[in-house]
Amino acid sequence: MASKMCEPLVIGRVIGEVVDYFCPSVKMSVVYNNNKHVYNGHEFFPSSVTSKPRVEVHGGDLRSFFTLIMIDPDVPGPSDPYLREHLHWIVTDIPGTTDCSFGREVVGYEMPRPNIGIHRFVFLLFKQKKRQTISSAPVSRDQFSSRKFSEENELGSPVAAVFFNCQRETAARRR
């Protein structure tokens, strides 16, 4: 069953380009505007993801803590992502079986603003070894590395991940 859960992440090149292969062990749900659920590979326009989503962790218990990272691995464009990855959000110390509003926001939410092509926006959930594992915010949102961040903070592999696609909304044509 775990390989079935990973399949969209492999096809979407999240596993490989963003993180190494892992088996999801916790269920995570991401919902924008109370009714727009994020499913792997689904498309959203920037106008529908302006506010931070509700992210629920369905696993562990109140003594388990999680770190959520949201990144864009396709900056500035998917054909030449030389600024990979762009950090959009970090929330730490999220108790298991709750949502991210119970955690500590280390880096505030930044809405997706893809300029060139279709970008993937990836939510990664890591289980912390203990509370307050993350000591400080990254210096820059640009050229962030999920792998390096996980390693530096001893987070290990993700326990859950989901991504959506997003592209610039077409401007109204003038006549």
From Swiss-Prot:
A single GO cellular-component term from the record reads: nucleus
Q: Which UniProt keywords apply?
A: Cytoplasm
Spell out the subcellular localization from the entry: Cytoplasm
Record-annotated disulphide pairs: none
GO annotation (BP), single: negative regulation of flower development
UniProt superkingdom: Eukaryota
What is the similarity comment for this entry? Belongs to the phosphatidylethanolamine-binding protein family.
Quote the function comment for this protein.
Not known. In plants homozygous for the recessive allele of the SP gene, sympodial segments develop progressively fewer nodes until the shoot is terminated by two consecutive. inflorescences.
Q: Quote the protein name from its UniProt record.
A: Protein SELF-PRUNING
Q: Which organism is it from?
A: Solanum lycopersicum
